[in-house]
Regions:
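Extended active-site and interfacial segments that coordinate phosphate-rich ligands
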Residues: 113-128, 292-296, 305, 317, ...
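P-loop NTPase motor module signature
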Residues: 1-424, 464-466, 470, 474-475, ...
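Extended hydrophobic-aromatic, low-complexity segments
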Residues: 401, 503, 690, 744-745
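Acidic, serine/threonine- and proline-rich low-complexity intrinsically disordered segments
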Residues: 430-500, 506-679, 721-781
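Residues in well-ordered beta-strands of folded domains
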Residues: 83-87, 101, 189-191, 248, ...
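Amphipathic alpha-helical packing elements
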Residues: 493-494, 500-503, 604, 672-706, ...
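Short, solvent-exposed loop/turn motifs
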Residues: 185, 404, 492, 500, ...
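Charge-dense polyanion-binding interfaces
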Residues: 123-124, 239-243, 247, 252-256, ...
């Protein structure tokens, strides 16, 4: 039975009826922390709809916790009416109608049954986390709903910006309905402690904490959790009445579950947690939250094909989620370890823009989508990231040259593995897969279950797809072909991408002779130099044999120490194996300049004021026409061979005139001169020079737009009554006194003459009595 004392209880009937009557069949539920949405909404939907209800949760511990809580509420065993599914662990039965599932399970289910025939409603909980899986599932669900008119979706979160989402789920004219529910029953007092260390804050709060209460401490990641734990242990914590627990996705699942155990009456509990405890989990007895203000995020370096773990300020939404943990049971407090005036971003960028999307792209190919623009995304993937993922999938034989998913690609989906690990598994090295998967740090029991499950799945894969390999290192190389690295001296290794990385310090200290070749499954790209966390040593013969058919011969023309050089190299990416100097020809100068531009940008080219003006005018033209801006300097750097190389033929230097002429030809200078002039004829007959500048948009001060600007002594615009325009955009007038001091800035001349000019005119007449001041008559001053 659903409790009637939850903040969300009075809204349940409205939620069900609004969803049933929603024209888009979507509903957004914005329910504050502790409203009871995860517990109460699924059973309410169960009573209102005939088929199954699926609720997606981003974390395994939340899946288990919610399934057990709902089952208890329904006075059932877990696996009865309410059950759960996650990788390696299911608890469902024939009578199960409500399933709490992890994200990857929903994707698999959609791939196997795109119409979800036995499901009435899919609930996407904690949607604000915007994982890759959730965004993909939502895009797939929008297509699945076209196959059935009785499939519904509820999007739930405590902190979410609803306007854009409701228009995406519906239309701009008819957005999806939004229901907002108040949550927290108890106030939370927020205190700002400044730069106090987390361990000191914990020790201070433990002294004030009553028995039977929990202090929940949010830290960026496992490194900080372990460091604070050590500091607390050194200070004498915990004692017989204080229990210290940690919560992080990398620790064993059994250890994670300990934080959900009930407290004893005499116990004070301190839980050191990552962001895993922000949502869905109800940690018993939390009355105090200590928030470090930081989060650990993955950032994908697309060019290098490596991820970089960064510690960043948490978002405002995240800070609200964290503080809300303290007000679920009684009046609580949140101690923020930063200053009140510190500025936080509203939300964290979605994972789809910052993480590895290789698996997502493979799922899309299996769905029948080969171009990301063919799916209706809430946030589209980055085009460069998509293209790099496709390139890697081709290297891994998951996609063929015709952009068709292969048997290897389908095997990856069946095995439930990242395409890289799938290749390792198909080589017959399941133990290596375990080591480089999330299960590598789990208990022995879980590891055995993972390996058994993988072996069972591998038996169903056709033998022709499997790869007979004897060496573990070669198996890993098959899955990480872009991560082969060569020793570059002093413990540094160079990758085909050009990135250099060092082996983790503790490991490096144990090595007497660094191997020539390694393959690196786990590496952080770093800011300027990466860090290698795990690797396999490659026998030089194996490396040589593997590279043999992958080496390419390239001719490079470039500047070295300001001298023009030409050489032929044998390489794999940026790993160079041999090079031979060649004679420089008269045509090589242009190629070298273009190579330098692509590498270093346009700064070394001689740009005069005329060329800079042309670039700004071309950008303005593109902006008004809604076209791609070919005048963007990053675009010009990439395309130097297209616009500059024809003008460099037979030359041995670059002049200002050459750069201008090349840009004028490439950007369509004649059309730009016609539409975006450098000089304008005012309605009083005077010709004046215009400039084009990047300025804040009048509608949105945070956005920069290009505007035509006219700086002019005010008498020179007498006799003009309407604001001049360029391509329909009003010219911004900077009106000056006879001494060229600023008087007014306006893009509405008629309004200026009527309302502002009379006061300015009085002052000008007093200061400059010999000048003419009738704005209605053209003046030669």
């Amino acid at each position: 039975m659903i409790p009637d004392d939850l903040p969300i209880s009075p809204f349940l009937e409205e939620i069900c009826s609004t969803l049933k009557n929603s024209e888009s069949r979507f509903l957004i539920l914005s329910a504050e922390t502790a409203a009871g949405k995860s517990t109460a909404v699924p059973p309410a939907l169960l009573n209102a709809f005939p088929k199954k209800i699926l609720m997606l949760e981003p974390r395994r511990l939340a899946v288990l916790s919610i399934a057990e809580r709902i089952s208890s509420m329904l006075e059932e065993e877990t696996g009865g009416i309410c059950g759960y599914r996650m990788h390696l662990e299911n608890c469902v039965s024939e009578k199960t109608r409500l399933e709490i599932i992890t994200e990857a399970i929903l994707t698999r289910r959609l791939q196997n049954d795109p119409a979800l025939e036995d499901v009435s409603v899919v609930v996407l909980d904690e949607f604000h986390e915007r994982s890759v899986h959730t965004d993909l599932a939502l895009a797939f669900l929008k297509e699945a709903m076209q196959l059935r008119d009785d499939l519904y979706v509820v999007v739930m979160s405590a902190t979410i910006e609803t306007k854009r989402l409701s228009e995406y789920l519906g239309t701009a004219e008819k957005p999806a309905p939004v229901i907002k529910v108040p949550g927290r029953k108890f106030p939370v007092k927020v205190e700002y402690a400044g730069n106090v260390s987390p361990s000191k804050a914990v020790l201070d709060e433990v002294k004030k904490c009553s028995p039977g209460q929990t202090i929940l401490v949010f830290l960026p990641g496992i490194f900080e959790i372990n460091r604070v734990k050590e500091e607390l242990l050194e200070s004498g914590m915990p004692d017989e009445n204080c229990r210290l627990l940690i919560l992080h996705s990398s620790i064993d699942f059994k250890e994670q579950k300990k934080v959900l155990e009930p407290l004893s009456e005499n116990e004070v509990r301190v839980v050191l947690s990552s962001a895993i405890a922000e949502t869905s989990l109800t940690v018993p007895g939390v009355r105090t939250v200590i928030d470090s203000g930081f989060a650990r995020l993955n950032r994908m370096n697309i060019t290098l094909g490596m991820e970089h773990l960064v510690t960043e300020r948490e978002s405002l939404f995240s800070a609200e989620q964290r503080s809300g943990r303290a007000g679920r049971l009684a009046e609580g407090k949140c101690i923020r370890l930063w200053n009140k005036n510190d500025v936080l971003n509203l939300e964290t960028p979605p994972e789809i823009l910052r993480s590895d999307i290789t698996s997502l792209v493979l799922e899309c190919f299996a769905w029948g989508v080969k171009d990301f623009s063919a799916l209706n995304w809430l946030t589209s993937p980055n085009m460069a990231a998509w293209n790099e993922a496709v390139k890697l999938l081709k290297e891994l034989d998951c996609i063929d040259e015709k952009n068709t998913i292969t048997e290897t690609g389908r095997a990856s989906l069946k095995l439930g593995l990242h395409p890289r690990l799938c290749k390792v598994a198909l080589c017959g090295f399941s133990e290596a897969v375990l080591n480089y998967s999330n299960y590598g740090r789990s208990s022995v029991q879980v590891q055995r279950r993972f390996l058994q499950d993988l072996e069972n799945r591998l038996k169903k894969i056709p033998e022709r797809v499997k790869i007979p390999v004897k060496e573990k290192s070669l198996a890993v190389l098959n899955g990480f072909p872009d991560r082969i690295a060569r020793h570059a001296g002093k413990g540094l290794y160079k990758f085909p991408s050009g990135r250099v990385a060092h082996i983790q310090k503790k490991e490096a200290e144990r090595i007497s002779v660094f191997p020539e070749w390694i393959v690196v499954p786990e590496v952080d790209s770093g800011d300027s130099e990466g860090c290698i966390y795990s690797y396999e040593v490659l026998d030089e013969n194996i490396a040589g044999e593997w590279l043999k058919n992958r080496l390419k011969t390239e001719v490079l023309v470039d500047f070295e120490n300001n001298r023009l050089c030409k050489k032929e190299i044998l390489c794999y990416g940026k790993l160079i194996f041999s090079e031979k100097k060649l004679n420089v020809s008269s045509e090589d100068y242009g190629a070298a300049v273009c190579a330098k531009i692509k590498r270093e940008g346009l700064d070394f080219l001689p740009f005069n004021a005329e060329a800079e003006s042309l670039l700004m005018r071309a950008a303005f033209y593109s902006e008004q026409k809604g076209m791609e801006n070919k005048a963007e300097k990053t675009v010009l750097s990439e395309n130097a061979q297209e616009w500059l190389l024809p003008f460099l033929s037979g030359q041995n230097s670059v002049s200002e005139k050459m750069v201008f002429d090349a840009l004028y030809w490439y950007l369509g200078g004649a059309e730009i001169d016609r539409e975006v002039p450098v000089q304008i004829v005012l309605s009083n007959g005077k010709k004046r020079k215009l400039t084009y500048e990047k300025l804040s948009s009048p509608e949105d001060k945070t956005k920069l737009i290009i505007r035509p600007v006219l700086e002019i002594i005010i008498q020179q615009i007498f006799g003009c009554f309407e604001t001049p325009e360029v391509m329909g955009v009003p010219v911004l007038l900077r009106l000056l006194s006879p001494a060229r001091r600023p008087l007014q800035i306006t893009d509405d001349l008629a309004n200026f003459w009527s309302n502002t000019w009379p006061e300015i005119c009085k002052e000008m007449k007093g200061r400059y009595p010999k000048h003419k001041w009738d704005y209605k008559i053209s003046c030669d001053e």
